[in-house]
Amino acid sequence: MANTEYIEFNNGIYPCPLCVAVGKDWQNDDFDDSCCREIEDDVPATTYDTYFEEKRKCVLIRFASKKAMTMEVIAHEALHATLFILGYIGSEATVYNSEPACYLLQWVVSCCEKVRLGKTE
């Protein structure tokens, strides 16, 4: 099976890139095998804390389709991605330390929205 495309985003602050892909039966040899399984019919998206391109750490959000990219689903997966990225740098979101997580969450949502709208150039 041919590699399916993904979009890589880097924000310049956190060392862990975010990758976003759309497709239920997505396959890409750049990624760990754990994230190349078909998304089940009732699951709109999945977020993976994984590695790609010769063991570089990354977070991958896979949406089953563009139709699945609703505000609710993007928000849900963006929070997973935010927590994975914070965990990678040894940080966490708390009531008393939420602002960095909020900005990171905002960035992840923005990346997903760019993919949804086809504005990734």
Regions found by a protein language model. Give the residues of each.
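Post-HExxH zinc-binding segment in Zn-dependent metallohydrolases
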Residues: 92-121
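Amphipathic alpha-helical segments in well-ordered regions
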Residues: 77-78, 108
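Catalytic Zn2+-binding segment of zinc metalloproteases
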Residues: 78-95
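N-terminal compositionally biased, intrinsically disordered segments and leader/signal-like regions
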Residues: 5, 47-48, 121
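Short, charged/polar N-terminal "headpieces" of proteins
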Residues: 1-41
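A basic- and aromatic-enriched beta-loop-alpha substructure that forms the phosphate/nucleotide-
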Residues: 73-75
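Aromatic-acidic/polar surface patches that form glycan- and anion
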Residues: 67-71, 95-98
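Active-site scaffold of zinc-dependent metalloenzymes
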Residues: 25-69, 81-85
